[in-house]
Amino acid sequence: MEKTQVLQIVATEPKPGTEAKFNKWYNEEHIPLAIKFKGMQRITRYKIQGENKQFPTYLAFYYFESKEAADAYGPSPEFAAVRKNKEETWKDDVYDMKWNVRYDLIKTWEGKGKK
């Protein structure tokens, strides 16, 4: 049976005045801890273009090699370390998680401009 890659998308919004601190933590602490999980293929972050308060400012894409890997992440020691770091770093409520959702891969098409 072929493994189906899973994409987990997390949308976040830092509170006013905390964006630099939030990004430093996310890039230098959160992602390095999360990427240690064996079934995590990669993590990619995006920031919305321009000023748009209708949608969350940041999206993080977590790519898991399979549904089994995505399901195993929650109870894993790696996720426990992520959660502990988040709780210790953000004792105050510095950002909002707007949503957190998973999708199963259907198919990938590659264009001529691929690297």
Provide a role label for each language-model segment:
Residues 1-115:
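Macromolecular interaction modules
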